[in-house]
């Protein structure tokens, strides 16, 4: 799912007119993995503008909460979606639309639900508020073939332990 590197730029775009400039800056910096959040009225316009660009991004969409969001992603040929939580209904619906769903997890129960529904990637969210790498270690002991995508509160000062984690 991740291309080139383990860094994903998480974007909440308020002004779609600025989205291409932002995208070009990220691309020129070597960041090609994007999670564009469906949180603003301009989110969809930004997604469409970036998709139409000649930039070879690996685009995922975040804050996917319902079937309507999945239908939109399918229409845009988006291959993966992020959610802040683990929701059985949307996990099942994502299979119907052939979209790789990456649910938010914070407990071993979340992991169990996600694995039971065929998820290969899990979003550890809100990473730093949950206890960071220490907490991740405690809930991921049974994870062998799954990959974790840590999000929330990670910055240039605390990123190294995440990049070095065996499941990330």
Model-predicted regions and their roles:
Residues 1-79, 86, 96, 145, ...:
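Conserved N-terminal beta1-alpha1 strand-loop-helix module at the mouth
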Residues 42, 65-68, 74-161:
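Conserved anion-binding
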